[in-house]
């Protein structure tokens, strides 16, 4: 009697090593699945900027623009309609994003540990043979495509008539753009923010999957903490890689570690977008989890900003939003009660 595929995999598991950190080689398993779907081996994938699907700025901009049209148009369509429950589809959405993130993270880990151990950190983040191998490029590309799946997060918010906040909408659109710029920019340091992001997403989407099941989990606050830690580490690596690139290229008299692979526009995009994430998520954390102190601070302002919905265009054009009236020399306007919510449904 022949063994089942699961028995074969379990039988192949050996003691973990540097080249086989999980006790079994994951790439051959991924190779079989990828080949069955695409008809060719993943290592034969040839990413060509402006040729490979979704590798042009026009395509990326069109999809991001469509995303914003859909969510804001959808909000208008849902204005006088009851909210959908969608608990089942929401559970499925969060479960498959948890699974995808976990699988990609495991594949990245298997590829990177031998490089880090044998060649060192600088080689892994700055040399094309370290951070831009054929195996890593296909993983970068697949990770980039998942950013468009994650846009469905906001569609659930719209259909469930949840508020659309600036942080949520900006973060989702900007992340798709960020992954595009790094993929086109051939930045070998990309694996650092990507693997950290995948790790956070495994935790985050699993949390929301369990929440949709009605299970209360106490560590929700730690998701935002992990995101902030992620952005800090990202910026350390991205700023270092950018610094050593620019100094070794244009300011050779300054201390530097040598050349670092990647395009200049990708460096500026990475530094700018991730820096904005750090500032926004710190503000979100303070506004959501830190109580106001006795002394006046910026926390109340941060909380107001965090809870504010994005402008309602229909209400503005129809003249339903009136300018604030002044009373006793201070601007005062009637506002609805705050709606506290996280960045997810």
Predicted regions, residues:
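Generic alpha-helical transmembrane segments
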Residues: 195-205
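Membrane-helix and juxtamembrane interface regions of eukaryotic multi-pass membrane proteins
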Residues: 1-193, 211, 215-229, 233-338, ...
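Surface-exposed charge patches
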Residues: 208
């Amino acid at each position: 009697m022949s063994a089942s595929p699961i028995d074969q995999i379990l039988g192949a598991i050996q003691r973990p090593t540097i080249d086989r950190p999980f006790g079994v080689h994951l790439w051959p398993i991924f190779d079989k699945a990828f080949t069955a779907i695409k008809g060719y081996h993943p290592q034969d994938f040839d990413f060509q900027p402006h040729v490979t699907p979704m590798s042009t700025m026009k395509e990326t901009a069109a999809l991001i623009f469509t995303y914003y049209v859909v969510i804001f148009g959808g909000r208008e369509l849902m204005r006088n309609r009851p909210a959908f429950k969608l608990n089942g589809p929401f559970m499925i959405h969060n479960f498959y994003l948890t699974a995808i993130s976990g699988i990609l993270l495991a594949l990245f880990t298997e590829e990177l540990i031998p490089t880090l151990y044998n060649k060192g950190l600088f080689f892994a983040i700055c040399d094309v043979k370290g951070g831009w191998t054929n195996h890593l490029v296909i993983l970068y590309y697949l990770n980039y495509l998942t950013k468009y799946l994650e846009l469905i997060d906001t569609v659930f918010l719209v259909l469930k008539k949840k508020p659309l906040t600036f942080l949520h909408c900006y973060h989702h659109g900007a992340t798709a753009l960020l992954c595009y710029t790094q993929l086109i920019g051939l930045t070998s340091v990309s694996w650092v923010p990507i693997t950290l992001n995948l790790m956070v997403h495994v935790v985050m989407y699993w949390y929301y999957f369990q929440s949709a099941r009605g299970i209360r989990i106490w560590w929700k606050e730690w998701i935002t903490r992990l995101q902030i830690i992620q952005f800090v580490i990202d910026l350390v690596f991205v700023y270092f890689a950018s610094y050593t690139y620019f100094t070794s290229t244009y300011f050779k008299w300054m201390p530097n570690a040598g050349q670092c692979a990647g395009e200049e526009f990708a460096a500026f995009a990475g530094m700018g977008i991730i820096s904005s994430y750090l500032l926004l998520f710190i503000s979100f954390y303070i506004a959501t989890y830190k109580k106001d102190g006795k002394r006046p601070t910026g926390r109340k302002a941060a909380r107001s900003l965090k809870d504010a919905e994005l402008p309602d265009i229909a209400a503005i054009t129809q003249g339903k939003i009136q300018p604030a009236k002044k009373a006793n020399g201070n601007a005062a306007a009637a506002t609805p009660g705050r709606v506290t919510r996280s960045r997810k449904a």
